[in-house]
Design a protein with these regions (language model features):
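Catalytic-core elements of nucleic-acid end-processing and repair enzymes
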Residues: 1-196
Length: 196
């Protein structure tokens, strides 16, 4: 319901109604703007991943992690970055594409006699899909682009910790590292643009 209301709100903006560059992914935009969805945000940019691993959103703004955040117990001392080499991503897609429903169904023809396929707002395939990574692409707002956004549609829990194709890069939290990343990302402004 909240995602539908979010989409209705976005459709009040003129540039949404005149957008003809590509499909608008309302679920993905909702996820990037703080609504809970079935999507897991991921990025192709290591510095963006580091920002989210070393900073926290606290009292309405981003700040670097400090010792009081990371030195509570063994669980909080370490951060984790999940990385999938790019050659594994397309291999995973090629091994799963036949599991999608209606992926080859023609829904009709356009005025030029070309095939028209159903436009999906999210994947129809809800069974085991091995954490497929979807490119978000260009969207009418800049946040997805500035975060080099991709997404995994998590219709059911498939923890990245259990996924053997994701490399797990564990690191020891360090207040100095957190501050440096925070400053390099201009306090988050480098990936959270001012959009009006």
């Amino acid at each position: 319901m909240r995602i539908a209301e979010f989409a209705m709100l976005l459709k009040k903006f003129e540039h949404i109604n005149t957008w003809n560059v590509c499909d608008i992914l309302y679920d993905v935009l909702a996820q990037h703007y703080g609504l809970e969805t079935g999507w897991l945000d991921i990025t192709s940019n290591f510095n963006v991943a580091l920002f989210f691993a070393t900073c926290t959103f606290d009292k309405g703004k981003w700040r670097p992690l400090n010792k009081s955040d990371t030195e509570n117990d063994e669980k909080t001392k370490y951060g984790m970055i999940f990385h999938m080499p790019s050659n594994r991503m397309w291999m995973r897609w090629s091994m799963n594409i036949d599991k999608f429903s209606n992926c080859r169904d023609v829904k009709g023809e356009n005025g030029k006699g070309e095939n028209v396929y159903e436009l999906l707002s999210h994947p129809k395939f809800y069974e085991k899909h091995d954490n497929l990574i979807y490119p978000i692409g260009f969207q009418p707002f800049m946040r997805c682009s500035m975060q080099d956004g991709y997404g995994i549609y998590m219709r059911r829990a498939q923890p990245l910790q259990d996924d053997i194709e994701f490399q797990k890069l564990r690191f020891r939290h360090n207040e100095e590292l957190s501050k440096r990343i925070f400053e390099e990302m201009d306090g988050g402004k480098a990936i959270y643009p001012h959009e009006g």
